[in-house]
Regions:
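ATP/NTP-dependent adenylation/nucleotidyl-transfer catalytic domains that generate, transfer
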Residues: 1-215
Length: 215
């Protein structure tokens, strides 16, 4: 393997197997939940080593590597401080942000959908939101929710958007994703059996939604 003058590594057109290795899928659990990966692109790999880590866990792991393992700043500070971006349009760029995910909130929301023994439903999320107890149930700061969603309409739109995405295209991507190193009580794959079906909202959800929007 030869290092170029620009600092990158050139492998002479050889794949990772030429060096007795394989390339990894670097999608984290938050990204896998909503399908933030490209078919036959960054979702490819032999193994997804951080596929069971939520976004905030990835940041914590990076800090741990710098502080405890390497005891120096191997990972640049910008890795932790730069505003994330989905880069889905010209308005969403690294540095300016534009990522529709509010990770301190959405990590906890998605975790409630997946990791609890009795998985939380959208109806329960709406009930807790109407009672003012959502932050307590999810384990996040209440200010994060109120700042991200100024009213019930924006909160509901966000909830439905991610719930639908989680159960449609994201399922197809997870099915084709590589094996995940499992560290939580429920990882995608064998721990979480799923089928690509139409997202479902029960009657209670629609009742609570109408109540919140009409108040």
């Amino acid at each position: 393997m030869v290092k170029s003058t620009g600092g990158s590594f050139l492998n002479g057109g050889k794949g990772p197997s030429s060096f007795g290795g394989a390339f990894s899928c670097n999608s984290n659990k938050t990204e896998l939940t909503v399908g933030y990966a490209t078919f036959y692109g960054d979702i490819c790999g032999a193994l997804a080593p951080i596929g069971d880590l939520w976004k905030h866990h990835v940041y914590e792991l990076g800090r741990y590597l710098n502080d405890k393992v390497f005891q120096r700043q191997v990972l640049p500070e910008a890795i932790f401080t730069i505003r994330p971006s989905a880069e889905l349009s010209s308005e969403q760029t690294v540095g300016t942000g534009g990522d529709p995910l509010v990770y301190p909130y959405h990590d906890k929301l998605f975790r409630s959908f997946l990791e609890q023994w009795r998985k939380t439903s959208p109806a329960e999320i709406l009930l807790w939101y109407s009672e003012g107890t959502l932050a307590e149930h999810l384990g996040c700061e209440a200010d994060i929710i109120s700042e991200a969603f100024p009213d019930a309409r924006s909160f509901i739109a966000d909830l439905e958007h991610w719930w639908k995405l989680m159960h449609t295209l994201a399922v197809a991507k997870r099915i084709q994703a590589p094996p995940i190193v499992s560290i939580t009580r429920r990882a995608y794959g064998y721990d979480h059996r799923e089928a690509q079906l139409t997202p479902y909202f029960p009657r209670e959800y629609h009742r609570l939604k109408a109540q919140l929007l009409n108040d």
